[in-house]
Amino acid sequence: MKKIITILLFILISNSIWASFIYVPMSYDNQKNHLKAYGIVYFGLEAGLKSKWLLNYDGGAFLIENNKAIENECKIRGVSYQIISDAKAQLILQEI
């Protein structure tokens, strides 16, 4: 039983290890500076990262390959973002 609890805690704590995408919402409610958000996507593309534009989802949100530099730029520029798992990204893509 102790082993199972340890494994479950490890999975919950290390969720960011398996996260493979940075989700940048573009809806009015979730993003305060849209121009800076587009700049983040451009920054990622210039760095050679793959991005997906989710035209009909959350105001035209973006999925960018998870990268620490992109995450840091989002923090510096004040861009709203979420780290999501590959499974959640696939669910979003299927919904579109």
Regions found by a protein language model. Give the residues of each.
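Sec-dependent N-terminal signal peptides
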Residues: 4-16
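Intrinsic-disorder/low-complexity accessory segments
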Residues: 20-96
